[in-house]
């Protein structure tokens, strides 16, 4: 098995390798893991404690400006095309979001061709942003509050209804982020919406493993990525930690069992 591994926001290949070592020690020794550096410089506006994060580090993108997300996606897709084939993709945090985006885009653009991966593994992953759902244009009012305007894309997720974009699950995360740093941004800003499981016409038919911590401090790390996938082909577990890999031996063993069961199901 050969896996493409994607790190999270303000992470590095080296840090992800270190975090994966306890779990890969429980997997077959002849499996291969290839790591891709994200490439964009993180910003303190997204991560206030960035100065304490070990360097080097990088992100796939910062705020979901359409051009930045598209650049990250195209770079990843080009890498898979040139360096593949890979048997699986394994994404942590924002890397998991990018892995899900890659599969969703394949489903949308090449529905009648084989997926680029036989399986996918997600650790502490969250929903990716969509190129099809349009953008929210956020602007500041005279009262220094954020006002959203929805510009639909190929898909109108509002279905003609007036939605509270400050609370809607497509956009609430981004609202909270930019509202916290609105005095340091230039407005207006146009940001992509996130995919929701209800947005896709059918579940992704790729065997998958989903792992998250019960103490994850990011509320948006939930079951949503799991819900994008065919439940008959998906396996999931939780562990006692937070926004990281399982650390207790019995949890690592269970994680490894889920991965191996998924690999066996491919044959």
Curated annotation (Swiss-Prot):
Reported consequences of knocking out the gene: Impairs the production of fusaric acid.
Organism lineage string: Eukaryota, Fungi, Dikarya, Ascomycota, Pezizomycotina
Expression induction or repression: Expression is positively regulated by the secondary metabolism regulator LAE1.
Hydrolase keyword on record: yes
Disulfide bonds: none
Pathway(s) the chain acts in: Mycotoxin biosynthesis
A Pfam family per the record: FSH1
Keywords attached to this entry: Hydrolase
Protein's recorded name: Hydrolase FUB4
Originating species: Gibberella moniliformis (strain M3125 / FGSC 7600)
Single GO cellular component term: nucleus
GO molecular function, one term: hydrolase activity
Catalytic residue list: 93, 183, 243
Uses described in the biotechnology field: Fusaric acid is phytotoxic to plants such as cotton and banana. It has been shown to induce programmed cell death in plants. In addition to a mild toxicity to animals, fusaric acid exhibits acanthamoebicidal, antioomycete, and antimycobacterial activities.
InterPro entries to which the protein is assigned, alphabetical: AB_hydrolase_fold, FSH-like_dom, LovG
The keyword Hydrolase is annotated on this UniProt entry: yes
PANTHER family listed in its UniProt record: ESTERASE ALNB, ESTERASE OVCA2
Job description of the protein: Hydrolase; part of the gene cluster that mediates the biosynthesis of fusaric acid, a mycotoxin with low to moderate toxicity to animals and humans, but with high phytotoxic properties. L-aspartate is suggested as fusaric acid amino acid precursor that is activated and further processed to O-acetyl-L-homoserine by cluster enzymes aspartate kinase FUB3 and homoserine O-acetyltransferase FUB5, as well as enzymes of the primary metabolism.
Gene Ontology BP terms: secondary metabolic process
Family: Belongs to the AB hydrolase 3 family.
Enzyme Commission number(s): 3.1.-.-
């Amino acid at each position: 098995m050969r896996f493409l591994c994607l790190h999270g926001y303000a992470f590095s290949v080296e840090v992800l390798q270190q975090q994966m070592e306890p779990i890969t020690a429980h997997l077959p020794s002849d499996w291969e893991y290839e790591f891709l550096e994200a490439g964009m410089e993180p910003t303190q506006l997204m991560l206030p404690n960035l100065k304490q994060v070990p360097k080097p580090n990088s992100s796939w993108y910062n705020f979901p400006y359409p051009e930045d997300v598209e650049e990250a996606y195209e770079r990843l897709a080009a890498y898979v095309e040139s360096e593949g084939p890979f048997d699986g993709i394994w994404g942590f945090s924002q890397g998991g979001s990018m892995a899900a985006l890659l599969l969703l885009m394949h489903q949308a653009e090449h529905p009648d061709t084989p997926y680029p991966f036989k399986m996918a593994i997600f650790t502490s992953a969250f929903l990716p942003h969509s190129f099809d759902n349009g953008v929210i244009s956020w602007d500041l009012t005279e009262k220094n509050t954020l006002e959203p305007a929805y510009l639909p894309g190929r898909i109108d997720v509002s279905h003609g209804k007036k939605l509270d974009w400050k609370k809607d699950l497509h956009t609430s995360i981004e609202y909270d982020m930019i509202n916290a740093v609105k005095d340091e941004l230039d407005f207006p800003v146009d940001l992509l919406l996130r995919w929701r499981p209800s947005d896709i016409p059918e579940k992704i038919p790729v065997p998958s493993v989903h792992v998250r911590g019960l103490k994850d401090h990011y509320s948006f790390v939930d079951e949503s990525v799991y819900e994008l996938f065919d439940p008959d082909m998906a396996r999931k577990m939780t562990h006692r930690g937070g926004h990281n890999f399982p650390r207790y031996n019995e949890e690592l063993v269970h994680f490894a069992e889920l991965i191996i069961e998924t690999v066996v199901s491919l044959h």
